[in-house]
Amino acid sequence: MSLTAGLTDARPDTVETATVAVIGTGAIGRDLVSKIDRSPGLDCRLVAGRNPESAGLRYAESLGCATTAAGIDAVLAASPFDVVFDATSAASHRDHWPLLEPLGTLVIDLTPSKVGQMVAPTVTGVAAEDARNVNLISCGGQASVPVVHALAARFPVTYLEVVSTVASDVAGRATRLNLDEYVTATGHAVTTFSGVSDVKIILNISPAVPPATFRTVIHARVPDADAAAVRAVVDRAAEQVRSFAPGYEVVACTAADDLVTIVLKVTACSDVLPPYAGNLDIINAAAVLVAEQYAARPGRVSRTGVSS
Amino acid sequence: MKQVVIHDPTLRDGQHAVHHRLGLTELRRYAEAADAARVPVVEVGHGNGLGASSLQVGLAAATDDAMLSTVREALRHSRLGTFMLPGWGTSDDLRRAISHGVDVFRVGVHATEASLAEHHLGFLRDAGAEAHCVLMMSHMASPGELAEQAARAVGYGAQAVGIMDSAGHFLPPDVTARIGAIVEAVGTVPVIFHGHNNLGMAVANSVAAAEAGARIIDGCARGFGAGAGNTQLEVLVPVLERSGFATGIDLYALLDAADLAERELMPAPPVPASMSIVSGLAGVFSGFKHRVVELAGAAGVDPREVFFELGRRQAIAGQEDLIVDVVAELSGRGPKTDAA
């Protein structure tokens, strides 16, 4: 299966654009709006927050997007859209989904709510044809799932541990309140896509100055692992991820005494994020890819949202 | 006489000194001895708390469930405490700990990150458990910042709040200023001080904390803890009593518990060894020690200089990669440009 080819070919030059709304105006919502703005296949029609003073709303206005501080209610009133991105919190998403579901919109959830179908583009493809709620797992999930999936497919992995470090100033309130959900959703994804049931997930929020670039360390127990073979598998997985998240790199990869340690780093490639915010960049890049491929899908019935 | 509550994390923070390998027999034996001395709170767990057994920091010898139930059974008078770091443990771990009969929960966060504890403090409050919030690496924040973070933690539901001198960097006036600012900010909420002994000041700092209004003071038998160790419990208690703070602890039984701890928990009691003194002076996480010594040795650089440079860069736990940069720079192999 040539997923990489599929992913890169999926950005059409000219097709009918998909109409898009974004809920949530934190750092992740702002970067999403920026990435949507750059995407020829997506037309951002509404950005909804809850605080009229938020910098995220002002940023969206500066790009010419319609904005509202009336949150989900405004999105429902202006519906239908082809795609609604939810960049709020896991608890908010669980409230939003029953309201959005009847509209037939594709909902792309960036919170660790575990509601929708989990997507890590290079592993799952972008989404099943009939998926209406696509879940992007978590930043640590996006960083680790391609590698743990590839490792477990090739080696008899018995235990997986995923330790991610996020800079404090790009961990907003929703992230801080959702640490349990992060751990649960990431663990569920790692187990689902590796088949390894014994997993441990850890998230560090680091206030270091200068801020630490987003890192994910994977520790795996692999009997008799061959270092060169592991490195080849990991490099191949990373190359695929770079097709949509170019700042994804393997910093270190060692195998000794049944213990494999892989250090991944994601540098943000974004108009609005600092380079260390790779956690937001990778999940948003995956989310926009899902929307772009949905927009390019033959036979898609377009929906119009509020005109801007 | 004023009262202080002694909180004893020997069986949790001490785990760092033995790679989290304390067995259930050792846990039970020390818990019984501390209980006999009427130590008010006995804390147990992996060194990084609930759910933290991992390849990243070390696999515990026993599960959280086994550790908690073993110590619970050993305590007749003392209350049972445990610890958690949000992002390492989860509410599921807290729920299970509650079911094991834990009385006092400590939620730890970096000094400037109280909001990371918001969810779990709220969870514990709603569950009716006693929850404390401790601000770690507190030398990296000013008294005013610590006071603000402490007040936030109280707003989230913390029933006691305080600071850990994780790097063992403070001198008594530093503690007086910080505890004073926190006491002023949180009013009647009990304030916690948890010392480390890198500069030999842990007991003196704890007395300064009590005099500045702290009402919960941490100490470990024989100072059992990573590097230079923690505040030495069996010295702390009589010194507090002589300073006018009642602890309710039986001194002879406490000395017996400390003797047992030295015999059964540790290869040797911790002392402020040279590298611990340097990391304390530099205000750097002592867990960097092995990596600093290893990399500096390989590059022919003085590891003491590496520690002081890491301190200037405000390196914190998790930034082990910075050690590589500093060693390379000090060895003259091309300075990096992204220094703070």
UniProtKB/Swiss-Prot annotation, chain A:
Residues where NAD(+) binds: T25, G26, A27, I28, N279
HAMAP family cross-referenced by the UniProt entry: Ac_ald_DH_ac (MF_01657)
Reactions listed under catalytic activity: acetaldehyde + NAD(+) + CoA = acetyl-CoA + NADH + H(+)
Species in which this protein is naturally found: Streptomyces griseus subsp. griseus (strain JCM 4626 / CBS 651.72 / NBRC 13350 / KCC S-0626 / ISP 5235)
E.C. number: 1.2.1.10
UniProt enzyme class: oxidoreductase
Stored Pfam families: AcetDehyd-dimer, Semialdhyde_dh
Source taxon at top rank: Bacteria
Protein name in UniProt: Acetaldehyde dehydrogenase
Keyword set, alphabetical order: Aromatic hydrocarbons catabolism, NAD, Oxidoreductase
Curated annotation (Swiss-Prot), chain B:
Site (Transition state stabilizer): R12
Active site: H16
Major enzyme class: lyase
GO molecular-function terms, A-Z: 2-isopropylmalate synthase activity; 4-hydroxy-2-oxovalerate aldolase activity; manganese ion binding
Domain of life: Bacteria
GO biological process: catabolic process; L-leucine biosynthetic process
Keywords attached to this entry: Aromatic hydrocarbons catabolism, Lyase, Manganese, Metal-binding
List of residues binding Mn(2+): D13, H194, H196
Positions that bind substrate: R12, D13, S166, H194
Start and end residues of each Pyruvate carboxyltransferase domain: 4-255
Catalytic activity reported: (S)-4-hydroxy-2-oxopentanoate = acetaldehyde + pyruvate
Annotated EC: 4.1.3.39
Family membership noted in the UniProt record: Belongs to the 4-hydroxy-2-oxovalerate aldolase family.
HAMAP family linked to this entry: HOA
UniProt name for this protein: 4-hydroxy-2-oxovalerate aldolase
Native source species: Streptomyces griseus subsp. griseus (strain JCM 4626 / CBS 651.72 / NBRC 13350 / KCC S-0626 / ISP 5235)
